[in-house]
């Protein structure tokens, strides 16, 4: 089963002959949605930007990253524009090298892509001449009307998935709800020969938002986008699994540490075997890319990866109204404490008063006693 899971769709770098000098290339996909910069930032991350700043020529790399962000946001927000052509490619922005070499700016571009899962139109091809790096898009996304439809579909899908998790009390629960919802919605995409599909949309978020199927990039990018939207810190992870290129996620959970999640493998295996796993478990068959001289294998250093799997039993549950003594149970002990407070026999602490004032009127009286009693009897929540 695992042998059918592919890697990131990235073609090897090659040299072409454009208008001036030579153009280099490589290949894959990203998004376009509503005219809202807030939505873009809500679904994205700046983790890669921060890491690039720690590298040699970090300031120049961050400038290039910012220019790429600006260019992609402009294309997302302007569905009335087309794209230019350079050699055989569709381009929507040229980024000056600004002191960087081709490999360095390629690392910046792929880091930018990994931070922003919505940009389906940002192809994984690396193209540059002597003076500029070009941001390239697949033919499928040249028309503004196509991008407008894609953007609306992305917005609708991300927000609908996020709503399913909004009522959960912990980041672990939210991450699990989104994981399960994605795997209920999607199926792994194969071509007619039963090999992993290489259609552009199977390698970006549109596979989930429009088609209901995709390869590992689709699973990982939509998971990344929804968790970002829910303000759960996470990373798109690239590397190898069972010897083949693969993509998954690292998610920061309630204890402050990051854990790996592989929605793709869990979907194919019909299990939760790769949800909230630590380095010890995941390293048995997953190897994360590292900062490397090859742009196509370059990946930032991930922080705070737990060595062990997450233990959901250690999640501290939020204290409920009526739980006056904070023991996690609402019972006769809480009624006794409130009654003693009302009679002036034992005054509650300021913290405990917050949970004794069940109706939230700023007073602690017989009304609160009645409501706590109703909770105990199962007549109220």
Language-model-detected regions and their locations in the chain:
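N-terminal accessory/pre-domain segments preceding catalytic cores
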Residues: 24-170, 288-319
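Cellulosome-associated attachment modules in secreted, modular CAZymes
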Residues: 20-25, 313-381
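Hydrophobic/aromatic-rich core segments of domains that either
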Residues: 218-283
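Secondary-structure boundary elements
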Residues: 147-208
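Extracytoplasmic/secreted envelope proteins and their assembly/folding machinery
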Residues: 65, 69, 105-109, 151-162, ...
């Amino acid at each position: 089963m695992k042998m059918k899971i592919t890697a990131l769709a990235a073609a090897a770098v090659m040299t072409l002959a454009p208008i001036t000098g030579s153009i280099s290339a490589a290949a894959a996909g990203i998004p376009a949605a509503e005219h809202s910069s807030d939505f873009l930032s809500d679904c994205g991350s700046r983790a890669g930007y921060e890491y690039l700043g720690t590298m040699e020529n970090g300031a120049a790399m961050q400038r290039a990253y910012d220019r790429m962000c600006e260019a992609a946001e402009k294309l997302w927000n302007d569905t009335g524009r087309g794209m230019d052509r350079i050699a055989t490619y569709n381009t929507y922005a040229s980024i000056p090298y600004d002191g960087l070499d081709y490999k360095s700016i390629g690392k910046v571009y792929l880091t930018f892509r990994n931070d922003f899962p919505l940009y389906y139109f940002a192809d994984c091809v690396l193209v540059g001449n002597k003076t500029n790096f070009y941001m390239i898009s697949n033919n499928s996304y040249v028309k503004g009307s196509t991008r407008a439809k894609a953007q609306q579909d992305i917005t609708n899908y991300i927000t609908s998935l996020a709503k399913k998790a909004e009522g959960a009390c912990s980041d672990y629960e939210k991450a699990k709800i989104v994981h399960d919802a994605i795997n209920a919605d999607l199926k792994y995409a194969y071509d007619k020969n039963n090999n992993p599909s290489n259609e552009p949309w199977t390698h970006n978020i549109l596979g989930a938002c429009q088609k209901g199927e995709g390869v590992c990039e689709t699973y990982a990018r939509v998971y990344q986008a929804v968790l970002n939207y829910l303000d759960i810190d996470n990373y798109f992870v690239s590397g190898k699994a069972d010897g083949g290129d693969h993509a998954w996620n690292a998610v920061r959970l309630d204890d402050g540490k990051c854990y790996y999640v592989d929605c793709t493998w869990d979907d194919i295996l019909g299990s939760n075997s790769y949800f909230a796993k630590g380095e010890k478990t995941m390293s048995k068959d997953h190897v994360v890319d590292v900062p490397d001289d090859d742009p196509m294998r370059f990946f930032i250093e991930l922080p705070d990866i737990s060595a062990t799997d997450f233990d959901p039993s250690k999640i501290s549950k939020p204290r409920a109204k009526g739980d006056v003594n904070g023991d996690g149970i609402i019972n006769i002990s809480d009624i006794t404490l409130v009654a003693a407070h009302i009679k002036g026999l034992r005054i509650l602490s300021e913290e405990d008063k917050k949970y004794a004032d069940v109706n939230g009127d700023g007073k602690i009286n017989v009304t609160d006693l009645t409501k706590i009693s109703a909770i105990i009897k199962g007549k109220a929540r």
